[in-house]
Amino acid sequence: MPGPFSSRSFAATLPNSIAARYRKQLQKHPFLLFGLPFMATIVAGSFMLTPATALRYERYDRKNQQITQEEAMGLRQERRKVNMKDEYYRLQAKDLEDWEQRRVKRLPGEPDGTLV
């Protein structure tokens, strides 16, 4: 009975292993034993990841909902009715000739636009 250090070469055991038989068959049928499982893994992974990507986009849509123009302006049902005649008379009643020009305060170091 041979011991752990037998004189039999390592190469002599290779033709009987599963890996050696697979390598030999791979040379005869490369697509069937390598390409087809690879492509099947890619397609199966795509189907498996579809719910995860859908969840990602649903979360994004929940966060960024489309709002109407009224909601963006903060207007709800408390809006007053607008009448063009009333608005015209209201603007006519304002005194637009009594105004004073004021300079805008500038930040420190910001040019104020004057040439001095």
UniProtKB/Swiss-Prot annotation:
GO terms for cellular component: mitochondrial inner membrane. The chain crosses the membrane at residues 30-50. The keyword Ligase does not apply. It is found in: Mitochondrion inner membrane. Its main location: mitochondrion. It comes from the Eukaryota. Residues 1-10 form a transit peptide. GO terms for biological process: mitochondrial cytochrome c oxidase assembly. The keyword Mitochondrion applies. It is a single-pass membrane protein. Disulfide bonds: none annotated. Keywords: Membrane, Mitochondrion, Mitochondrion inner membrane, Transit peptide, Transmembrane, Transmembrane helix. Belongs to the COX16 family. PANTHER family: CYTOCHROME C OXIDASE ASSEMBLY PROTEIN COX16 HOMOLOG, MITOCHONDRIAL, MITOCHONDRIAL OUTER MEMBRANE PROTEIN 25. Required for the assembly of the mitochondrial respiratory chain complex IV (CIV), also known as cytochrome c oxidase. May participate in merging the COX1 and COX2 assembly lines. This is Cytochrome c oxidase assembly protein COX16, mitochondrial. It comes from Phaeosphaeria nodorum (strain SN15 / ATCC MYA-4574 / FGSC 10173). The gene is COX16.
